[in-house]
Structures are given as C-alpha cells and as structure tokens.
A protein has these predicted regions:
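ABC ATPase NBD Q-loop/coupling interface
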Residues: 1-12, 252-265
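Conserved ABC ATPase "signature" region
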Residues: 50-67, 297-312
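Conserved ABC ATPase signature
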Residues: 71-75, 79, 316-320, 324
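Catalytic Walker B motif of ABC-type/P-loop ATPase nucleotide-binding domains
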Residues: 96-99, 341-344
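H-loop/switch region of ABC-family ATPase nucleotide-binding domains
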Residues: 131-132, 376-377
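The feature captures the beta-strand-to-loop junction immediately N-terminal to the Walker
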Residues: 228-230
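Helix-to-loop junction immediately C-terminal to a conserved catalytic motif
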Residues: 243
C-alpha cells in the first residue's frame, strides 16, 4: 500500500491490512456472529446503510448464511475460522495476512476458501499466508518463502515450489504439495465386547436439539479410530460426551462391556481439546505434565524430549507457540495413563516432522493397548495414522 510500517499508526495500517489469526477466538469482540461481522466496519466509521450492504455481500459471496444469527460460542472450530475470515473480508482491505487459515476446516470449506483467495488475487489484492497444509495452494501461490529460526532461508517461484522433489520437501519439513486420497486397508476383526462401545447415543447442549442422534459404533484397543465430517456436524460434541464433559441424552457408553456414567468416563478418558488453551493451567511446561497425573520426573523429561519441548521445562505454557502448545497437550495425554485417549485436531498447526511424530505416537499408544480416537480433517495424517475412519453422516471408511 506504499505506507512505511514503522512510521504509520496501527489504526491506519488496520484500514489496509486485514489479519486472520491462528486462533480465531483471539480476534472476536462480540457474542453473536452478526455483530462480529459489523464490528470492524463500525470501527472504521462506515455509515450504517453501507455496513448492512457490505455484510450482506460478504454472507452471499462467502456462502456463510448458516453462520448468521448465532452465538459464537455455539460454533465449531472450523466455523469460527470461517467467521474470522469473513469479518476481515467485510472490511475489504488491500492486504490479507492469514495464519494457518485451514487448520480446522473440512475439505469443502478449504475449497471455498481457495476459490475466494483466487478471487482476491484477481481483484488485485495482496495475500500472505503462513501455512503448513500446502496442497490447496497449488494453483494459488505465486511465490513461497521458507523461514527457519526467524530468517528467510529459501525463496521459491511457483514453478520451483511445485516441482520440489519429495526428498527435499521432507528435508525441509513441508507437508505434501498434492491432496491426499484416503485409501485405508480393510479393518481387521476385533473381539466382541471389548473396547469403548457407543449404542444409540444422542447428545447435545442444554436447551438445544441433539447434535448427535442415534449413533452406534465401537472403538477397540489396538486401533486408531479417526472421526471426521463437515464443520459443525457434531464431532467435538460427540467426544465431549464420550469424555463425560456433557451428559448423554439417549443411549449408552460402555467400556469393556460395563456401562459408564459421566463421572466414570471422566476417570477413564483423556481429551486433548481442539483449542488447547482451555486445558493448560500450570505456570510451567513441567508442571503441566505433573498436573496431568505424571509423577516420574524421568518419564516427564523423556516425553518432553520426544515432543521437542525439552528446552521449555520452565517456560509458561501460554508463552509457547500454537504448535508447541498442541504438542504439550498431546504429551500430557500420553503421561496421564488413562485407557481411552481422544484427540481433537491434534495436528492443527503442525509441520510435516511434528505431524509424523504425532502419527507415530498415536500408533504406539494403540500398540500398547490404548483405545485411541482422533478427530481430524487432516487427510495426510489420517492416511498414515488411522485404521478406520468414522465419517459422521456418511459411510465408514476402512470398514
């Protein structure tokens, strides 16, 4: 925009640069979606009639009518990401900066975002994306910059980026440059009565219709069961119920054939949440591991080293990056010693190497006899990590 950043007031920069953060909740100012879309425009002093028109145009072009007139706290993680992008889009900035914009989006939402970013380019907008999930950028990117330790190490043209050899991609810790097709092997037979059994389950939130209705499946020891589906279909609601964070309205949940009440599920299940900020409470990384129930100092240090957190023992968890927080939460799950381990988008914001480490970790937990469930939209991760995938609202894959 021709403005020297150091000499320009933040409020002036904000008129030209729109930012979508990795954690969309950190940029929300209202409780309802309509007000959130209007907020930025109101701050710019846009007349009310123009605000109404811009919001209507945003909703129509981004196809987010289903997000309107809703409480933001009722949105899924992916829906919050879409709302954050829409709130910036409504302000019509010249420059867009997006931090991990697809981290919690399903395939359909990623495709919508990709098309919208192409449109922004055609309109002459500048788009800067910090991203680990790369496949959706294939026909979008003009230049790719590789950063290590805060410095630009490599710069690729579009042709160079897309022609990168796999060995070079892996060496740099980059994700696949092409979309992964799920192709799971035929699931093996499991012993009846074993595992976590869900029968006719119905669950949801107070004063709202059940999100999950009449759902039945079994997660067995020794396997990694993936759970996927569109944003807002009820994946997080389901696993919160399995862990005893919300009550079931219908049906039953059993472990090894014994029906578990809510408090019993809390004792037997450990959940790594989609937004790990909700479960990091200690004033140090080491203390967080102790709080998870681990008492063996050597075991804690071994787990932290495994997840590249060995140098951060005394660091406050809130001072970690998004990916580091994610790895810390996964480490606490491993150290908890519970029978059922459930991960909600565990590879969100992770590069190739750390994604492969989480993949190996969940596979090893399954081999150790744990019951492992993983909610994810990350096809590259699910292909390598999961034995079966339960597609909510669709036919199960690998069955």
């Amino acid at each position: 925009a021709g403005m020297p950043v150091r000499d320009t007031a933040v409020y002036e920069l904000a008129k030209e640069v729109g930012s979508v953060f990795q954690n969309p909740k950190s940029q929300f100012f209202h409780l309802d979606t309509d007000s959130e879309l209007e907020f930025g425009l109101e701050n710019e002093g846009v007349p009310p009639e123009q605000i109404k028109s811009r919001v209507e145009t945003t909703v129509r072009q981004l196809k987010i009518k289903k997000l309107m007139h809703r409480n933001i706290f009722s949105l899924s993680g992916g829906e919050k990401q879409l709302l954050a992008f829409a709130s910036v889009y409504a302000m019509n900035p010249q420059i867009y900066t997006l931090d991990e914009p697809t981290a919690n989006l399903d395939e359909e939402a990623i495709e919508k975002l990709r098309k919208q970013l192409i449109r922004l380019k055609e309109e002459g907008k500048t788009v800067v994306i910090a991203e680990h999930r790369l496949y959706f950028l294939a026909d979008l990117v003009d230049r790719a910059v590789y950063i290590r330790d805060g410095r630009i190490e490599k710069s690729f043209s579009k042709a160079e980026f897309l022609a990168m050899e796999e060995t070079e991609r892996i060496r740099l810790g980059l994700r696949k440059l092409r979309r992964t097709t799920l192709d799971l092997e035929k699931a093996r037979a499991y012993e009846a009565g074993k595992g976590l059994g869900i029968c006719g389950l119905g669950c949801g939130y107070k004063d709202e219709p059940d999100v999950i209705k009449d759902l039945s499946f079994t997660a067995y020891p020794g396997e990694v069961l993936g759970i996927s589906g569109h944003n807002g279909v009820g994946k997080t609601t389901l696993i919160r119920c399995l862990c005893g964070l919300i009550r079931e309205q219908k049906g039953s949940i059993s472990l090894e054939g014994d029906v578990l009440k809510r408090k019993q599920r809390q004792k037997n299940c450990f959940l790594v949440m989609q937004d790990v900020n909700h479960q990091l409470f200690s004033d140090s990384v080491f203390g967080e591991c102790e709080q998870a129930g681990a008492s063996d100092e050597a075991g804690i240090r071994e787990a932290l080293a495994q997840f590249d957190l060995g140098d951060y023992e005394e660091t406050h968890p809130m001072a970690l990056s998004g990916g580091q927080k994610q790895r810390l939460a996964v480490a606490t799950a491993v150290l908890s010693g519970k029978k059922v381990l459930i991960f909600d988008e565990p590879t969100s914001g992770l590069d190739y190497r750390h994604m492969k480490e989480v993949c190996e970790m969940v596979r090893n937990l399954a081999k150790a006899g744990k019951i492992v469930l993983v909610v994810s939209h990350d096809r590259e991760f699910m292909q390598d990590a999961c034995d079966r995938i339960l597609m909510l609202g669709e036919k199960e894959e690998g069955a």
